[in-house]
Amino acid sequence: MKKLLLGSFLVFSSLMSAQLFLQLENTRIGVIGGPNYSRVRNAHNPSYPRYSFYGGLLALIPLDYENQFYIQPQVEYLSSGEKGEGSTLYANNYISVPIYFKGYFTEGRDSFFAFAGPRFAFLINQKVQNPASPLYVKDKIGKARGFDFALSGGLGYSINRKFEILARYDFGLSSVYPDLVESWSGDPNVYRKKSQHILSAGVSYIFGE
C-alpha cells in the first residue's frame, strides 16, 4: 500500500512538474487595446453611453501541448462610465485585471478563438463634469465604489497566433454607485443595482512563437 501511494505521488509530482515547466517555458507576453462603449444601469438620470478606450499587457499561458487552450491574464487601464446630456460626464477609470480561459477552435496558426472569465477592476480616479444634480458629485452620493467585479467574455480571430482582433462584453455584477439611492430623484430605478456594462473591440499582438 505504501509503495502504491509513493508511486502515485511520484507520478502526480512528475505530471505537475511537467505542466509547470510547459507553462513557464512557453508563456508569451503581448499588448492589447481598443475602444469601448460603456453604460451604468439605473444610475444617473438622464444617462447615455460613454465611448472611451482600454489598453495594457497580457500573458498567454499554455494549458496543453497542442497549443489550443490557455489561461490569459491581463493588466489594463480601463476608462469607462457614462454620459448625460450635453457636456455632462460621469467617468470612472480603473486598473482592470481580467483572467480568461482562452480556447482556439483549431490547432492551426490562423484560427477563431473564444475566451471567458472574471474581471477585477480597481478605481484609480473618478471625474464628474456638469452633473445633472449637485448630489451626483463624487464627494456626495455620486462617489463610485473602489472595486468593480464583472464577468467578461468574447470572440476573436488570430492571424499566425500573433496578431489578433477581438470583441468582448463585460457584464457588471457590482453596484458602481452604492450610495446613489435617494428617492428624491423620482427615478423608479433608484434602488436597483447600478451595474456597469462594457462592450469593447480590440487588437492584440503577442510576442514570441
Model-derived features: where do they sit?
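Transmembrane beta-strands of outer-membrane beta-barrel pores
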Residues: P35-R39, I61, Y77-G81, N93, ...
